[in-house]
């Protein structure tokens, strides 16, 4: 098999469209096989689009989100696999309430690791992407996604582990997504000001020390994917329960984004092949 294969592991449907989506669309368009693995069904996600906040949607939210995910995958040109766990929800309050019984974040780690190992050994990706140890933000399912992904990356290559889950496969590189960068937000906010408009990012920037962008300091790899930003946004809009089309995400014109920040960012977390940093290609150094 000489084709390149990329696996993007995400916690919920819609995460694949808000984190690294233009990169996955680019590689799929260039002929790589790309698979998105979604660990939960997003059953406990809030409805964030007022137009979809309807009783008939609430009553069948799991089915609706599956349909949304199928549309987004088609738009991005990727394959898709559900790992089959139940959304934990985002606990709120002080003190935080306990997580619901049976949710993904409370399932013993070995269960999702074994399922993901099986998918890895079947798809045989050269590269995987997932979240950092903080989950990108501290949602319990995102943190668990990190733990599961890293454990499965290691276990899939070990013939002693999960021998009934297929022939061992060593993924060559593992990356963390890093899409929430202060400098990008600052550039876009300044562009609004230059055009006599009030940008939507002031509320974020005022509490964010410009000298302490911990995410930017971790970036090793910047993938040029500006021509796929339209696909990214179309895929995100496909998740109509989760995305308000009038929300902040869509305020900055695509043309500004393409000119000011034409890349998506990643952190190389683990590699089994020689690497030279910084990079501009997730497949750099990979042996097909």
Swiss-Prot record:
Catalytic reaction(s) noted: mycothiol S-conjugate + H2O = an N-acetyl-L-cysteine-S-conjugate + 1D-myo-inositol 2-amino-2-deoxy-alpha-D-glucopyranoside
Instruction: Name the cofactor(s) required for activity, per the record.
Output: Zn(2+)
Q: Which GO molecular function entries does the Swiss-Prot or TrEMBL record give?
A: hydrolase activity, acting on carbon-nitrogen (but not peptide) bonds, in linear amides; zinc ion binding
According to its UniProt record, this protein's enzyme class is hydrolase
Q: What's known about how it's activated or inhibited?
A: Partially inhibited by MSH when MSmB (a bimane derivative of MSH) is used as substrate.
Q: What happens when the gene is disrupted?
A: Loss of amidase activity on MSmB, no production of the mercapturic acid product AcCys-mB. Limited degradation of MS-RifSV, a rifamycin S MSH conjugate. Increased sensitivity to streptomycin, slight increase in sensitivity to rifamycin but no other antibiotics tested. Increased sensitivity to iodoacetamide, N-ethylmalemide (NEM) and redox cycling (oxidant) agents known to conjugate with MSH such as menadione and plumbagin, but not other oxidants.
* Classification via SUPFAM superfamilies: LmbE-like (SSF102588)
**Listed InterPro entries:** GlcNAc_PI_deacetylase-related, LmbE-like_dom_sf, Mca
| Textual note on the cofactor | Binds 1 zinc ion per subunit.
Membrane-crossing residues?
Answer: none
The Enzyme Commission number assigned here is 3.5.1.115
List of residues binding Zn(2+): 12, 15, 142
Entries under Pfam families matching the protein: PIG-L
Q: How does this polypeptide assemble, per the annotation? A: Monomer.
**UniProt name for this protein:** Mycothiol S-conjugate amidase
Tell me which species this is from.
Mycolicibacterium smegmatis (strain ATCC 700084 / mc(2)155)
What taxonomic classification does the UniProt entry list for its organism?
Answer: Bacteria, Bacillati, Actinomycetota, Actinomycetes, Mycobacteriales
Q: Which gene encodes it?
A: mca
